[in-house]
UniProtKB/Swiss-Prot annotation:
GO BP, one annotated term: glycolytic process
Cofactors demanded by this protein: Mg(2+)
Protein name, entry field: Beta-enolase
Entry keyword Cell cycle: no
Species: Thunnus albacares
Superkingdom in the source lineage: Eukaryota
Subcellular location: Cytoplasm
Gene that this polypeptide is encoded by: ENO3
Molecular functions per Gene Ontology: metal ion binding; phosphopyruvate hydratase activity
Cofactor note: Mg(2+) is required for catalysis and for stabilizing the dimer.
Keywords: Allergen, Cytoplasm, Glycolysis, Lyase, Magnesium, Metal-binding
Reactions performed catalytically: (2R)-2-phosphoglycerate = phosphoenolpyruvate + H2O
Length: 12
């Protein structure tokens, strides 16, 4: 799912 990837790059 792309949502998880987006969340990851935000909190990275």
């Amino acid at each position: 799912s792309i949502t998880k990837i987006k969340a990851r790059e935000i909190l990275d």
